[in-house]
A protein has these predicted regions:
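Bacterial Sec-dependent N-terminal signal peptides
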Residues: 1-26
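Acidic/His-enriched low-complexity segments
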Residues: 21-220
Length: 220
């Protein structure tokens, strides 16, 4: 009798474990934040758009400091991008890129509170990003082109971004984590007929000779 009942008891035991795990209060689950090795200080961007290919051509100046320990490398999130150049003080740096994260070798070790600014020239390709979003935001491409070639006359042509929670790195290299804070400024170049909107204050608008306009937004 005991031998025959044993499998049933084991099955009930596992069902009980599964049920308990499924009904656990979500607020009681510990969700560890990402380790903070380098801290973002400031982000400066210059961006323009390829409407046909749904891509962004960008330059980024990213200022960081070691959070606590001395560092000789830095890892930046950058999803599905083409990386053209990475430099510091006009000297090109060695790096490894796996299509998700750029690991950059710094020219020396930096101690806590010693700031350094990386320059990165890149192309963002949001249509090649494969990560998924959430129930509320089903996609996580970070950068969205709406009717980019103006074919659908019932829709306006728009480009907009959505960075929560880790989708900003689909359109510019960064440490894409909610526990990072950065001041920012951005130069956005668009055809003259478009309006731009960004965080911060619109400091200037410059008309270019090719029929585009560069808007400078400052949030520092």
């Amino acid at each position: 009798m005991t031998i025959r009942r044993l499998p049933i008891l084991i099955i009930v035991f596992f069902i009980s474990i599964i049920t308990t795990a499924q009904t656990k209060d979500p607020l009681s689950i510990y969700r560890k934040e990402r380790d903070k090795i380098n801290a973002l200080e400031h982000t400066k961007l210059k961006v323009s758009f390829d409407f046909k290919n749904k891509e962004l051509d960008g330059e980024a100046w990213i200022t960081l400091k070691p959070h606590f320990y001395e560092v000789s490398k830095v890892a930046l999130d950058a999803k599905a991008m083409l990386i053209h150049q990475i430099s510091l003080n006009n000297n090109n740096l060695q790096y490894h890129y796996d299509n998700k994260v750029i690991t950059i070798d710094l020219p020396k070790s930096y101690k806590k509170d010693a700031a350094y600014t990386l320059y990165i020239k890149y192309t963002a390709r949001p249509e090649k990003v494969v990560q998924t979003g959430s129930a509320a935001i089903t996609e996580a491409k970070g950068l969205y082109f709406i009717n980019s070639e103006g074919i659908d006359t019932s829709k306006p042509t728009q480009i907009w971004t959505q960075g929560e929670t880790e989708a900003s790195s689909c359109w510019f290299p960064t440490i894409d984590s909610p526990n990072q804070k950065t001041s920012q400024e951005i130069y956005i170049t668009v055809p003259n007929r478009f309006k731009t909107l960004s965080n911060g204050k619109l400091e200037s608008q410059t008309n270019n000779s090719d029929g585009t306009r560069t808007d400078y937004w400052n949030f520092t």
